[in-house]
A protein has these predicted regions:
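Active-site mouth of glycoside hydrolases
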Residues: 1-116, 124-149, 155-181
Length: 183
C-alpha cells in the first residue's frame, strides 16, 4: 500500500501543471531530472544488507516508473553515495547500474560523517579535506565504471566553531569549498 501511495505522489508531482507558466512539469524544459528520494538507503547499518536486493529492485522499478511518466527527463536516485549504501561501493554501483538510472548522485557532509570536528573544523581540516577529495574521486571513478555521469548534488561545511552567527568566521569552510570547487 505504501508503494502505491508513493507512486501516486510521484504521478501527481510529475503531471502537475505549473500554476505560474501553465506547463506540466513533465513537459517543462526547465525540469532536467527527477530523483527517487533524498538520500534513499537500503538500511542504515550492516543490518540493512539483507534489504539490498529489495532496495535495488525498488530503485530499478521506481526509476522505470518515472521514465514512463517523463521519458524526456533524466532520472537518478538522489543517493548520498557509498556512505548511504552501507559504506559499500558495490552496493552503490549495483543500485545505479539499472538502465533506468541515467546518472549517479552523491553528497558530501564531512562534519556529519565525523571526518571533521563539527565544533572545530580547522582541527581536522587537512585530514577531512583529504578524505573528502578521495570520496569525490571514488565516486567519479565508479561513475566511469558504469559509463554514466555523476553529480555532487549536496555538500557543505559549518561555519567555524559550529556557530550559526553570520558574524562568525568561515576560514575552514572557505578552504573546504575552494578544494571542492578546484576538484
Amino acid at each position: 500500500q505504501a508503494q502505491a501511495w508513493y507512486r501516486d505522489a510521484i504521478r501527481t508531482v510529475i503531471t502537475r501543471r505549473n500554476s505560474v507558466n501553465g506547463i506540466a512539469y513533465v513537459d517543462d524544459p526547465t525540469v532536467m531530472s527527477w530523483q527517487l528520494a533524498n538520500e534513499p538507503r537500503p538500511g542504515s547499518n550492516a543490518g540493512g544488507a539483507p534489504n539490498f536486493q529489495v532496495y535495488r529492485q525498488w530503485v530499478h522499478d521506481t526509476a522505470g516508473f518515472i521514465r514512463q511518466l517523463a521519458p524526456r527527463q533524466l532520472v537518478s536516485t538522489g543517493s548520498e553515495g557509498a556512505k548511504g549504501s552501507l559504506g559499500e561501493d558495490d552496493y552503490y554501483l549495483l543500485a545505479h547500474a539499472s538502465p533506468n538510472v541515467d546518472y549517479l548522485t552523491f553528497h558530501l557532509w564531512p562534519s556529519n560523517w565525523d571526518w571533521m570536528d563539527h565544533h572545530d573544523p580547522a582541527a581536522r581540516l587537512d585530514s577531512g579535506l583529504e578524505t573528502s577529495l578521495a570520496y569525490i574521486d571514488r565516486h567519479v571513478q565508479m561513475a566511469a565504471r558504469l559509463g554514466k555521469p555523476t553529480v555532487l548534488s549536496e555538500f557543505g561545511l559549518n561555519r567555524d566553531r559550529g556557530s550559526y552567527d553570520p558574524a562568525s568566521g568561515v576560514t575552514a569552510r572557505d578552504r573546504f569549498y575552494q578544494a571542492i570547487y578546484a576538484r
